[in-house]
């Protein structure tokens, strides 16, 4: 794979991965537009407007210079008190992983908190995030594709050790590209 000027290839995975990573925001909290970092050129493109009336409940993006089992950079969701915009690079701490199956394929998400947000920066494990907020997140992902007749199932949550293990593997797999 040719490594071009995409955010995926040009931004490092973080200042101290896997404990402190960069997350490139693709979709801000509160959006229905599903943006994606372009893999083939610098920039961000609109993938689609989601079919439901739901909006993303948190910042959603990717950890650069990673390669996951789905052939894309590893997905990351960042809990923070304010929304940003596509292309913003956040300093984030992995605190867990949401295990998910999307249309029959594994599509796990790394759960992070923004290190520059005093509301969330002291959280070290996803279990410290209010249970209702986690349920809202789970509900969003299990519901937002229903009008497309696609099934998404959250199959569980894991702690920061598993998340960091997945990040390490994704960084190593990226280096093999």
From Swiss-Prot:
Keywords, sorted A to Z: Cytoplasm, Hydrolase, Magnesium, Metal-binding
InterPro entries in UniProt: Pyrophosphatase, Pyrophosphatase_sf
Enzyme class: hydrolase
PROSITE patterns: PPASE
Residues at which Mg(2+) 1 binds: 70, 75, 107
Lineage top rank: taxon: Archaea
Binding site for Mg(2+) 2: 75
Single GO MF annotation: magnesium ion binding
One GO-annotated biological process of the protein: phosphate-containing compound metabolic process
Family to which the UniProt record says this protein belongs: Belongs to the PPase family.
Subunit structure: Homohexamer.
Role: Catalyzes the hydrolysis of inorganic pyrophosphate (PPi) forming two phosphate ions.
Name of this protein: Inorganic pyrophosphatase
């Amino acid at each position: 794979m040719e490594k071009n000027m995409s955010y995926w290839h040009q931004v490092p995975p973080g200042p101290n991965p896997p404990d402190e990573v960069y997350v490139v925001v693709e979709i801000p909290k509160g959006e229905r537009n599903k943006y994606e970092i372009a893999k083939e050129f610098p920039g961000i493109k609109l993938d689609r407007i989601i079919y439901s009336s739901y909006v993303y409940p948190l910042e959603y993006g990717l950890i650069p210079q990673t390669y996951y089992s789905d052939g894309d950079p590893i997905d990351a969701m960042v809990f923070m008190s304010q929304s940003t915009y596509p292309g913003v690079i956040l300093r984030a701490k992995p605190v867990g992983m949401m295990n998910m199956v999307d249309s029959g394929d594994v599509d796990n998400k790394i759960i992070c908190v923004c290190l520059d947000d005093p509301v969330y920066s002291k959280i070290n494990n996803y279990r410290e995030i209010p249970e209702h907020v986690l349920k809202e997140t789970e509900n969003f992902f299990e519901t937002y594709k229903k009008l497309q007749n696609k099934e998404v199932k959250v199959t569980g949550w894991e702690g920061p050790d598993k998340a960091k293990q997945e990040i390490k593997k994704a960084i190593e797999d990226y280096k093999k590209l």
